[in-house]
């Protein structure tokens, strides 16, 4: 509360395997209520149900639009990966994952449209691509352009010197060379 460099309180990263979205809704509301007893100034970031899936946001996290924040400073966080099951494991290649240039846009659009329809702020808290095929970069470029066009911020998943050199999604240069 006393630090001016805190952007938001993140309630939980990738809630999943809960009984229902209502359960996550109830937990999130309790957290919001508790935080607001001590801090009315800092934004609260709420991740979506089922791994914060942007693609399935309306299906699995729509009830979050009914959360109440007396400070009116809620924001929402979704995650997006471009592989076949949207897990970010990229177990198969670009072709085997049936990837195409607008796949990232198609995956994030439900979340972006939900934010707009409900007049909420939000961000993509995780996205990333493997370094195994340069075509993933083209998908990422289109995705990032779409986020920029819609004033949505995002965070790449694997960056920083603590990632192993062989981490397939890391973007940190290795031995002075960009990936």
Predicted regions located by residue number:
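Extracellular glycoside hydrolase catalytic/binding regions
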Residues: 3-8, 12-152, 170-178
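Short, solvent-exposed turn/loop segments enriched in Gly/Ser/Thr/Pro and often Arg
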Residues: 48-50, 157-164
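Short secondary-structure boundary/hinge segments and terminal tails
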Residues: 133, 164-165
